[in-house]
């Protein structure tokens, strides 16, 4: 193998490695988005469970921890009780570096 062939092989491996690193970052971001959505669904179930037990929606995350809710590390959950019968939940990264997702109890949708 000549020096030129070796340099070509090293260049190709470098290009493939840079593509792979970008893809891994994209997959990690998608996985974290899925974690935030999952946390919202679980928190909504915990809110309903709390309501079933205490006949009101809680204002704090500490309250839904009592009924079994556990969030993913690195996900910040915000609870906003908009009326006695409705609430919204927002999941985001604490540093705000990614999108946030919001669950609305009136529609049951995550946006």
PLM segments and residue spans:
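Regular, well-ordered alpha-helical segments
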Residues: 18, 26-29, 45, 49-52
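Conserved catalytic core of two-component sensor histidine kinases
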Residues: 10, 37, 44
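Alpha-helical interaction segments
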Residues: 14-17, 22, 39-41, 59, ...
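N-terminal single-pass transmembrane signal-anchor helix
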Residues: 1-24
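Aliphatic-rich helix starts adjacent to a transmembrane/signal segment
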Residues: 23-40
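Periplasmic/extracellular, small/polar-rich flexible segments of pilin-like filament-forming proteins
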Residues: 45-111
């Amino acid at each position: 193998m000549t020096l030129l062939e070796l340099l070509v092989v090293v260049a190709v491996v470098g290009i493939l490695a840079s593509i792979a690193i970008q893809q891994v970052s994209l997959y990690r971001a998608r996985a974290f988005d899925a974690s935030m959505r999952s946390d919202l669904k679980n928190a909504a179930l915990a809110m309903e469970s709390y309501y079933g037990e205490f006949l009101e929606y809680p204002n704090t995350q500490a309250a839904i921890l009592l009924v079994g809710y556990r969030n993913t590390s690195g996900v910040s959950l915000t609870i906003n009780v908009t009326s006695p019968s409705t609430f919204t939940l927002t999941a985001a990264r604490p540093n705000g570096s990614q999108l946030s997702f919001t669950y609305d109890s009136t529609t049951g949708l995550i946006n």
